[in-house]
């Protein structure tokens, strides 16, 4: 009988060892998981990096600013800024008694390339609250001696907007053609709605 007791004890000990080994294995898996998730945070503030250099109006790339040969005054800077606005140069024209249309010359760059006249606006507020750009002509054109050029008009055509970031942020309301009234109210050129 003592042999039978030894076998039963030995069998019971083997079963107990198997259960402990099995439990240890499961426990090891729980201690070393295969996946771990964590959280990260970032806070954005409105930018105020100064004036953004002008970019090519037809192929805007912030890493390739253009270099105008006769730049206008520096832009406004700030979180919402007008960075660049072309000078309108109509050249020397012959006086005529007939109605004439004169076109502003393209902006000449220091590399010799020519770009259409344009205005560049940068919005670094991060609010998507929209903005508007209006233009005005404070008074009628005048000759060098100060005489008004009666009936002269400043007309903008083919207006369009381009976004450097994503087409989703391109202003949807762009006045593609507008005529200014000398001494009149501001005329809306672009409305970047929120």
Regions flagged by a language model, labelled:
Residues 3-10, 24-194:
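Signature of Gram-negative chaperone-usher
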């Amino acid at each position: 009988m003592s042999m039978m007791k030894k076998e039963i004890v030995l069998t019971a000990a083997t079963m107990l060892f198997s259960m402990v080994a099995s439990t240890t294995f499961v426990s090891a898996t729980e201690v070393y998981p295969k996946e771990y998730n964590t959280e990260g945070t970032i806070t954005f503030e409105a930018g105020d990096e100064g004036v953004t250099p002008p970019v090519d109006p037809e192929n805007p790339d912030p890493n390739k600013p253009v270099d105008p040969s006769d730049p206008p005054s520096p832009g406004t800077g700030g979180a919402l800024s007008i960075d660049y606005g072309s000078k309108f140069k109509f050249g020397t024209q012959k006086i005529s008694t007939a109605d004439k249309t004169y076109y502003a010359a393209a902006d000449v760059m220091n590399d010799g390339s020519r770009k259409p006249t344009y205005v560049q606006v940068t919005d670094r507020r991060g609010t998507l609250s929209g903005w508007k750009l209006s233009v005005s002509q404070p008074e009628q054109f005048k000759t060098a001696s100060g005489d008004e050029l009666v009936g002269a008009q400043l007309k903008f055509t083919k207006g369009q907007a381009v976004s450097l970031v994503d087409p989703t942020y391109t202003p949807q309301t762009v006045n593609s053609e507008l005529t200014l009234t000398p001494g009149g109210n501001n005329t809306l050129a672009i409305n970047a709605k929120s």
